[in-house]
Amino acid sequence: MTTTTNRIAFQGEPGAYSHEACRKARPAMEALPCRTFEDVIDAVRSDQADLAMLPVENSTYGRVADIHHLLPESGLHIIEEAFVRVHISLLAIPGTPLSEVREAMSHTVLLGQCRGFMRRHGILALTGADTAGSAKEVATRGNPSLAALAAPLAGEIYGLERLADGIEDRQNNTTRFLIMSRQPDYSRRSDRMLTSFVFRVRNIPAALYKAMGGFATNGVNMTKLESYMVDGVFTATQFYADVEGHPEDPALQRALDELRYFTSSLDVLGVYPADPLREAQRQAA
């Protein structure tokens, strides 16, 4: 891959968890904030950025809405995954004691992850547009009774004080991100490679059951299989899958060949190494 801008695009304000993921995965690259997921993809396609950082699922709240619809049409390729722990801090105007905070603002998903802390301290929840945007608003208002729930990075960027760290209810809360590029990279090999693809089955009885049979008979582990409607039509279903292995591995090659027989379309989205945290989480489960 030839780098032209040394930028990685993400959705949200500076200080968002996607921004934190960019810093973790590509610390030498400039992070480019974008308003929407579509804008992130367009930034790479239009050469404003080299890579896109997109969240796809959270261990507490499941898959991120709309992402699986965007991936097949993006024209981009998955080259890496990044697991990022969601550490939540209570951020306020510097010098504010915790006892003075009456309300905390954040994205509705993050508010739901800190119910225990909020209840213990009598803090009311206010819904904001996003996590980093809420931190920015708290800094702008300058009201000591108003705080934000966001990543510690947001506090650094907007000059807020961290009154409490690690206030999330679930200490293993993790978001999985995909790093995407204009060009695929099938050259890398390791013991833990992943292949992601989307497919539609042919309109024949038991097509999905038969399509999945090749992975079982060839000993290929499927780590994810999700379905979603296409264009809002109940009868038009597309499937997204992650499997262990490289398409050039004989076992996976045979499984994909069998899958093709029962599908009307099959598109590989990317081949990439598994994040080390994936195995650590599996062993801890």
Residue ranges and their predicted role:
Residues 1-285:
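Domain-level signature for soluble enzymes in the chorismate/prephenate branch of the shikimate pathway
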